[in-house]
Design a protein with these regions (language model features):
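Conserved alpha-helix/loop element of class I SAM-dependent methyltransferases that forms part
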Residues: 29-48, 64
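Conserved class I S-adenosyl-L-methionine
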Residues: 48-57
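Conserved SAM-binding loop of SAM-dependent methyltransferases across substrates and taxa
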Residues: 58-70
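Conserved SAM/SAH-binding beta-strand->alpha-helix loop
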Residues: 80
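Conserved SAM-binding loop
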Residues: 87-88
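Conserved SAM-binding strand-loop segment of SAM-dependent methyltransferases
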Residues: 95-107
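Short conserved loop adjoining the S-adenosyl-L-methionine
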Residues: 108-114
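S-adenosyl-L-methionine-dependent methyltransferase catalytic module, highlighting the catalytic core
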Residues: 121-122, 130-229
Length: 230
């Protein structure tokens, strides 16, 4: 006898993302299907076979990445245990075997322990971190390709937030707010500072793929960074 999926999803509520199971939609109101950020990622890193996803939330993008032809493995890191439970629940329903979910506080975790990858997919995370430069400094050693979608600080709103870096402090909702970071505040760097920081961290090529300074939630940018393989 098949379980009542509506009731099973309700046990893990609230949900952010919507998932289609056997032709029916469950979960939240937002569908990741057709998200242009995923398509831009694969245009940027078309040969990525192994992918590290940073900040996977409920796994909606993880499953789309994993189902892409040619992708053999996606390791998705997420800070909230409830989100991991949700992602693994949906993973079992969708029977996706090449995705793996692990809990990690990306404000402080040493990512080297997770190994090396062809590409890093970092969408919707960077602007939730109090010290994003600490994460960025680790990334060149993990993969030659880095894809970022993030909000950034407009220059008019910026001040010095760390040595040599300009940005603004953004209030977060805390651990109980599912779309917030884990700390009370986050740092939004200016776009110029973010791109310069990527170069200083070891990427030989940093490309502004798309800039949306009028985004409803604050200026946002899609960035691709590459380093030469050793």
């Amino acid at each position: 006898m098949k379980p009542d999926l509506t009731a099973e999803f309700a046990k893990l509520a609230p949900w952010i993302f919507q998932f289609r199971i056997d032709g029916r939609d469950y979960g939240g109101a937002i569908s990741a299907v057709g998200d242009v950020r995923v398509e831009r990622f694969f245009r940027f890193a078309p040969k990525a076979v192994t992918i590290l996803e940073l900040g996977s939330l409920e796994g909606a993008h993880t499953f789309i990445l994993a189902q892409r032809p040619g992708v053999k493995r996606v390791l998705a890191l997420e800070g909230r245990e409830l989100n991991l439970r949700k992602a693994r629940f949906v993973q079992e329903l969708l029977q996706i075997s090449n995705a793996q979910f692990e809990q990690a506080n990306l404000e402080e975790t040493n990512l080297a322990a997770f190994g090396k990858f062809d590409a890093v997919f970092c969408s919707g995370l960077m602007y939730h971190l109090p010290e994003p430069w600490k994460l960025i400094s680790q990334l060149p050693a993990l993969a030659p390709n880095l894809f970022i979608w993030t909000h950034y600080a407009a220059e008019a709103d910026a001040k010095i937030v760390s040595e040599g870096l300009r940005g603004k402090i953004h209030l977060e909702g805390g651990p109980e707010e599912p779309l917030s970071g884990l700390s009370p505040t986050a740092t939004w760097l200016t776009l110029d500072c973010l791109m310069a920081l990527l170069t200083a961290s070891g990427y030989q090529s940093v490309e502004l793929i798309y800039d949306d300074p009028k985004h409803v939630n604050g200026p946002s940018a899609t960035i691709g960074a590459r380093r030469e393989s050793p």
